[in-house]
C-alpha cells in the first residue's frame, strides 16, 4: 500500500493543472476507487489536503517525496570506517541512508559524523540545513557507539515522521 501512496504523491507533485479523478487514477495505475482510498489515507496522514473540489500536496507530502527520491549516482553517500576502508554500503536516498544507519558499523557513523560528512551531504545534496544542524548538534554532544546511531535515527525520524 505504501508504494501506491507514494505513486499518488509523485503524480500529484508532477501534475500542473486540474484533472478529473479518472484521468488521475489512470496516471497512477489504479482504479478510481483505489485512488480515492489512497487519497483519503494521504489526507489522514497530513500528506495531502483538500483544496476546493480537489486535492493538493502538503509540505509534509513534499518532504516525504524527498525522502524516497533517488539522488544521482555521483551524489550517493558511501559509508567508510576509515579513509580507504569502504563498508560496501551506499545511500542513494534519505530512506536508504536511514536504513543503512540502522545496520552499518558504529565505527563508520563515528568516522563520518566527526568529519562532518553527514551534515555536508545533507546540505549539498538535499539543501537541508535544518537536518544538517541536527547532525552537527550530535557531534557537539560527543555521542559515540549505539547512542550516536540512535541520535542520527531520531534526528531523521523527527524530521520526516518515520
Model-derived segments and spans:
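Amphipathic alpha-helical packing elements
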Residues: 108-141
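Short amphipathic alpha-helical interface segments
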Residues: 1-28
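A short, conserved structural fragment
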Residues: 43-53
Amino acid at each position: 500500500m505504501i508504494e501506491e501512496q507514494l505513486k499518488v504523491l509523485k503524480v500529484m507533485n508532477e501534475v500542473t493543472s486540474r484533472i478529473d479523478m479518472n484521468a488521475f487514477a489512470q496516471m497512477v495505475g489504479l482504479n478510481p476507487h483505489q485512488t480515492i482510498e489512497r487519497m483519503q489515507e494521504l489526507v489522514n496522514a497530513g500528506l495531502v489536503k483538500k483544496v476546493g473540489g480537489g486535492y493538493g500536496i502538503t509540505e509534509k507530502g513534499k518532504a516525504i517525496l524527498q525522502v524516497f527520491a533517488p539522488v544521482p549516482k555521483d551524489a550517493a553517500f558511501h559509508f567508510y570506517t576509515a579513509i580507504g576502508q569502504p563498508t560496501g554500503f551506499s545511500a542513494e536516498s534519505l530512506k536508504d541512508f536511514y536504513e543503512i544507519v540502522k545496520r552499518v558499523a558504529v565505527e563508520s557513523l563515528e568516522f563520518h559524523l566527526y568529519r562532518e560528512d553527514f551534515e555536508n551531504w545533507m546540505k549539498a545534496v538535499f539543501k537541508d540545513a535544518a537536518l544538517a544542524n541536527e547532525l552537527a548538534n550530535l557531534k557537539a554532544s560527543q555521542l559515540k557507539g549505539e547512542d550516536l546511531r540512535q541520535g542520527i535515527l531520531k534526528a531523521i525520524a523527527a524530521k520526516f515522521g518515520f
